[in-house]
UniProtKB/Swiss-Prot annotation:
Alphabetical list of NCBIfam families matching this protein: L21
Family according to the record: Belongs to the bacterial ribosomal protein bL21 family.
Name assigned to this protein: Large ribosomal subunit protein bL21
SUPFAM superfamilies: L21p-like
Transmembrane stretches, start-end: none
InterPro entries: bL21-like (IPR028909), bL21-like_sf (IPR036164), Ribosomal_bL21 (IPR001787), Ribosomal_bL21_CS (IPR018258)
Length: 102
């Protein structure tokens, strides 16, 4: 059994027990989150929503919050003696899928 959910403008294929790294959102650690934006669900037969499947929910449990590896952005303009180096670390929220309700 799997479902395709939408979270923060991105789509994820999930099944029970999966460990996901989502974009950061405010939630306590060990909190339970219900995602009702289920685009498709497969439970012996595929149900596709228009745009969402009615009555379907995915229950997620927040494990922790953290930061990814640093991404470095480097711009150089040749022969202009101009360069720019910036970096950032994207924040994420790690969750585990507890239940899929069709």
């Amino acid at each position: 059994m799997y479902a395709i959910i939408k979270h923060s403008g991105k789509q994820y294929k999930v099944s029970v027990g999966d460990d996901l790294k989502l974009d950061h959102f405010e939630a306590e650690s060990k909190a339970s989150i219900e995602v009702s934006e289920v685009l498709a669900i497969n439970d012996k037969e595929l149900k596709v929503g228009a745009p969402f499947v009615a009555g379907a929910k995915v229950v997620l449990e927040v494990i922790n919050h953290g930061k990814d590896k640093k991404v470095v952005i480097y711009k150089k303009r040749r022969r202009k003696d101009s360069k720019l180096k910036r970096g950032f670390r994207r924040q994420f929220t790690r969750v585990v899928v507890k239940d899929i309700k069709a």
